[in-house]
A protein has these predicted regions:
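Glycine-aromatic micro-motifs
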Residues: 1-90
Length: 90
């Protein structure tokens, strides 16, 4: 389902977004997956080099708090445009 991550900012890195710690709210989606898929997702996301996986607090649409894995951008965002809405549109 959909969720909000408070205390983060989303940047437009061109072909993809990058979430970093910040003063905003990032809107995204939460999926339940088998634990064994995390290594595969790490590879897809370029972790731990391009992105790093961290457990963060999110709030679901029904206001339920949840700890979820998120991929935070692991490089500088200087020069990248902030996505003010906090939501990446594909």
């Amino acid at each position: 389902g959909h969720a909000l991550a408070k205390g983060f900012a989303l940047y437009d890195l061109g072909a993809y977004p990058g979430m970093v710690p910040g003063d905003g709210v990032v809107r995204g989606e939460v999926y339940e997956i088998p634990e064994g898929l995390l290594r595969e997702l790490d590879w897809v996301e370029g972790a731990p080099f391009l992105f790093r996986r961290e457990l963060i607090e999110v709030v679901l649409e029904d206001h339920t708090p949840l700890r979820a894995h998120a991929y935070l951008y692991n490089r500088e965002v200087e020069g990248a445009a902030l996505v003010p809405s906090g939501e990446w549109k594909v």
